[in-house]
Amino acid sequence: MKNTDAMVIDTLKEVGALLEGHFLLSSGRHSNRYCQCAQLLKYPEKAEKVLKVVADQLKDIDFDLVVGPAMGGVIVAYELGRQLGKPAIFTERENGEMTLRRGFTIEKGQKVVITEDVVTTGKSFKEAAKVIEEQGGEVVAVVCIVDRTPGNVTDFPMYSSIKLDIESFEAENCPLCKEGVPYIKPGSRNIK
């Protein structure tokens, strides 16, 4: 384990962001562990330190704009934009569709980094990428605090503060469901 990995894990535990239990993820899968990065993001100094790990990985990437899908990517986009001297905006859902609102625009040819707090399946950042590309922007990387993908979920280069292997299950194969353990649904995908 790298020193930065230990620092990130220790910080996530310290703020109560790494949870144990039975969780219904926004992807629809179930897990016995959950990373609630909102618990990290409520502490600006700790978030700054954890996001510096991924900001350092972006130093040699040529990009113009940071875009974070609401909800999890908004503060991450702001903080990475602040650390790297880039403007930051966000996409959000309107009537269930990811879109740009609030006067935000992406110029044709702008190079964009998409941010997230946690990436599991990549659904949110893929929706944001579609919006960016429809506006004429070019996605050059995806970054997150926690990468918990089971493998390659994107053709875009992906950078993270930490890679965590957290097992997840389809609902019909979930051992916690079979044991009758009730789940909680901590994600934000259903925000309209």
Swiss-Prot record:
Known pathway: Pyrimidine metabolism; UMP biosynthesis via de novo pathway; UMP from orotate: step 1/2
Binding site for orotate: T120, R148
One Pfam entry name: Pribosyltran
Keyword Nucleotide-binding: no
Keyword annotations: Glycosyltransferase, Magnesium, Pyrimidine biosynthesis, Transferase
Group of enzyme by EC: transferase
SUPFAM superfamilies: PRTase-like (SSF53271)
InterPro entries recorded: OPRT, Orotate_PRibTrfase_bac, PRibTrfase_dom, PRTase-like
Protein's GO biological process: 'de novo' UMP biosynthetic process; pyrimidine nucleobase biosynthetic process
Positions annotated to bind 5-phospho-alpha-D-ribose 1-diphosphate: E116, D117, V118, V119, T120, T121, G122, K123, S124
EC number: 2.4.2.10
GO MF annotation terms: magnesium ion binding; orotate phosphoribosyltransferase activity
Cofactor(s) needed for function: Mg(2+)
Similarity field: Belongs to the purine/pyrimidine phosphoribosyltransferase family. PyrE subfamily.
Main function: Catalyzes the transfer of a ribosyl phosphate group from 5-phosphoribose 1-diphosphate to orotate, leading to the formation of orotidine monophosphate (OMP).
Complexes and interactors: Homodimer.
Stated name of the protein: Orotate phosphoribosyltransferase
Lineage of the organism: Bacteria, Bacillati, Bacillota, Clostridia, Eubacteriales
Name of the gene this protein is made from: pyrE
